[in-house]
């Protein structure tokens, strides 16, 4: 797991493009048959990716988290941006098609990711944050997401935000698959 320390807001103002990229850009997230994670001391967030091609990949805590298992004190959201894949959470299998997501709550011990077809591997992008309460695992389809349109064309900042895991989702019971 790569570690990133916080930067002083005052110092960041003096960074040139190369330094900004060095401090904040995450590259090469999707590596065949690997889980890559970057831990940022800013908000203690972990950004990561898993691209299982020829084998299933298990999410491990690593010594950086000082935990018995990855979600012992954390929660996470996973979105599949590749081919069809499966995420197994404590023995329950969830099939994630392209753009499907899953919220996995604190306390889940085993998270395993695999591709259905190695010629079209799943690409699981995820974020994980500290959690203080356990919520159930929730399977999320793109049509379940909350879409928010922001900005304007006139201001050159028009965009659509697709919220896979708004706060209310952790309290809902959505389809399990």
Outline where the language-model segments fall.
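Surface-exposed beta-loop interaction hotspot
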Residues: 114-169
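Glycine- and acidic-residue-biased ligand/ion/polar-headgroup-sensing regions
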Residues: 42-45, 50-54, 71-90, 172
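Short beta-strand His + acidic residue motifs that chelate non-heme Fe in jelly-roll/DSBH
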Residues: 87-88, 104, 110-117
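Basic/polar N-terminal segments that are highly enriched at the extreme N-terminus
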Residues: 1-5
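Intrinsically disordered, low-complexity, positively charged segments
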Residues: 7-63
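Short, amphipathic alpha-helical interface elements at domain boundaries
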Residues: 66-67
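Conserved small/polar residues in nucleotide/adenosyl-binding loops
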Residues: 170-176
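Short acidic-glycine-tyrosine-enriched beta hairpin
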Residues: 91-106
């Amino acid at each position: 797991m790569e570690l990133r320390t916080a930067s002083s807001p005052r110092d960041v103002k003096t960074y040139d493009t190369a330094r900004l990229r060095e401090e904040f850009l995450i590259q090469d997230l999707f590596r065949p048959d690997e889980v890559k994670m970057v831990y940022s001391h800013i908000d203690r967030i972990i950004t990561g990716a898993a691209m299982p091609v020829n084998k299933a990949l298990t999410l491990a805590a690593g010594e950086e988290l000082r935990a018995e298992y990855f979600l012992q004190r954390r929660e996470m959201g996973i979105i599949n941006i590749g081919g069809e894949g499966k995420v197994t959470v404590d023995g329950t299998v969830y099939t994630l098609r392209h753009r499907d997501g899953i919220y996995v709550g604190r306390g889940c011990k085993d998270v395993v990711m695999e591709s259905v077809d190695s010629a079209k591997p799943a690409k699981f992008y995820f974020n994980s944050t500290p959690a203080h309460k356990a919520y159930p695992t929730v399977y999320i389809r793109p049509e379940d997401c909350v879409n928010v349109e922001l900005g304007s064309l006139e201001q050159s900042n028009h965009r659509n935000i697709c919220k896979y895991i708004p706060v209310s989702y952790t309290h809902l019971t959505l389809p399990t698959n």
